[in-house]
C-alpha cells in the first residue's frame, strides 16, 4: 500500500496564502542586492553612516 504524502497538498494550500509575502520578500531582496552592488569604496568613504559605524 502506498503511503499518503501530505507535502504536495500542504504546499498547494500554503502557496495560495503566502504568495504575496514571498513575492514581496523576493522583490525587496533583489532591490537591496542591486542597490548595494552599485556602491563603491569611494561611496563608503564619503558616507556618514559608514563613518559612524566603522570601528
Curated annotation (Swiss-Prot):
UniProt entry tagged with the keyword Cytoplasm: no
Annotated transit peptide: 1-11
UniProt entry tagged with the keyword Transport: yes
Positions in coiled-coil regions: none
Source superkingdom: Eukaryota
GO annotation terms (biological process): proton transmembrane transport; response to cold; response to hydrogen peroxide; response to mannitol; response to oxidative stress; response to salt; response to sucrose; response to water deprivation
GO CC field: mitochondrial inner membrane; proton-transporting ATP synthase complex
Keywords: CF(0), Hydrogen ion transport, Ion transport, Membrane, Mitochondrion, Mitochondrion inner membrane, Stress response, Transit peptide, Transmembrane, Transmembrane helix, Transport
Ranges that cross the membrane: 21-39
Subcellular location field: Mitochondrion inner membrane
Membrane topology listed for this record: Single-pass membrane protein
Factors inducing expression: Induced by several abiotic stresses such as salt, mannitol, drought and cold. Under oxidative stress caused by H(2)O(2), transient induction followed by strongly reduced levels. Induced by sucrose.
Family: Belongs to the ATPase 6 subunit family.
Role according to the record: Mitochondrial membrane ATP synthase (F(1)F(0) ATP synthase or Complex V) produces ATP from ADP in the presence of a proton gradient across the membrane which is generated by electron transport complexes of the respiratory chain. F-type ATPases consist of two structural domains, F(1) - containing the extramembraneous catalytic core and F(0) - containing the membrane proton channel, linked together by a central stalk and a peripheral stalk. During catalysis, ATP synthesis in the catalytic domain of F(1) is coupled via a rotary mechanism of the central stalk subunits to proton translocation.
Protein name, as recorded: ATP synthase small subunit 6-A, mitochondrial
UniProt organism field: Arabidopsis thaliana (Mouse-ear cress)
Protein's gene: ATP6
Amino acid at each position: 500500500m502506498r503511503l499518503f504524502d501530505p507535502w504536495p497538498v500542504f504546499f498547494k494550500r500554503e502557496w495560495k496564502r503566502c504568495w504575496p509575502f514571498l513575492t514581496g520578500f523576493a522583490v525587496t531582496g533583489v532591490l537591496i542586492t542591486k542597490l548595494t552592488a552599485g556602491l563603491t569604496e569611494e561611496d563608503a568613504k564619503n558616507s556618514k553612516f559608514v563613518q559612524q559605524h566603522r570601528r
